[in-house]
A protein has these predicted regions:
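N-terminal Rossmann-like NAD(P) cofactor-binding subdomain of oxidoreductases
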Residues: 1-119
Length: 119
């Protein structure tokens, strides 16, 4: 199943790094983080004041994060409604924003055909 990570703060970065470390990077379809630009996300993922430097195989090219041989779309939207979700694939959203904690706030994910949401 494809994975979308919404929020690349402390938890989102750790989820991203762990998926890559476990060789599951090809399952990551997209990341969304409203803070910074799309190209900033490579820097934020690579350098962490607590967890150190990571991601020798990570780079930002052509509007995407590339890890090893896999391209990951990057968005910088502030609301769920503005994120361009896939139309045909089943996907899991890992919401690491810390904001969307109630069923009502998670509804937009399911309206956009998310199969599962993990908060």
């Amino acid at each position: 199943m494809k994975i979308i990570i919404n929020g690349l703060g402390r938890i989102g970065k750790l989820v991203f790094r762990r998926l890559c470390d476990e060789n599951l990077h090809k399952n990551i379809l997209m990341v969304n983080e409203k803070a910074g630009t799309a190209s900033d996300q490579e820097y934020f993922l690579r350098y962490d004041t607590v967890h150190g430097t990571w991601g020798d195989d990570l780079c930002f090219e052509n509007g995407c994060l590339n890890y090893k041989d896999h391209s990951i779309d990057v968005m910088t939207e502030g609301s769920i409604e503005d994120i361009s979700f896939p139309k045909s694939e089943k996907f899991l959203v890992v919401d690491c924003t810390g904001v969307n904690k109630s069923e009502k706030l998670l509804e937009p994910y399911f309206e956009r055909k998310a199969s599962y949401v993990l908060i």
